[in-house]
C-alpha cells in the first residue's frame, strides 16, 4: 500500500509541476499569443491576401515612420513615457494604414486562399515583428515590464534584425 501512496504522490507532484510550468510558460508568452490571435482573426476577416498586405504595409509603415521629419518632435511633445509610446504607436498605425490601403487593392485578388498553417505562421511572425517594434521603436519596455523570457528574446539590439526580416522570410516560404 505504501508504494501505491508513493506513486500517487509522485503523479500528483508531476501533474501539479507540469500544470504550473505550463501556466508560467503561457503567462510569459501571453503578449505574443494575444497579438497572434488578433493577426489570425484579421487574416480571416480581411479575405484573400489580407495578412500578406498587412505584413508588407508594416514595412511601408516602418519606412514612413522613420523618415517622417517630425516624428521626434511629435513624440517629444508627449510628457510621460506612456503618452510618448501611445503617440508613437498612433503615428506608426497611420503610417501603416496608408500603404495598407493601396497594397490591399493591388494584392487582394492575386493570392489564392491561404490554409490555416500559413496564416498561423504568418500571424505569429507579424506578432513578433510588432513586439520587436514595440521594444526598439516605441520603447514600450519603459512603461511595461515584460517577463524575462520576452526580454531575452526581444530586447537585445542584435536580435532586432532577425525579428524584422522574419515576416519577409515567412512570405517567401508561404506565399507563391
Regions found by a protein language model. Give the residues of each.
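Alpha-helical transmembrane segments and their juxtamembrane interface "caps"
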Residues: 2-176
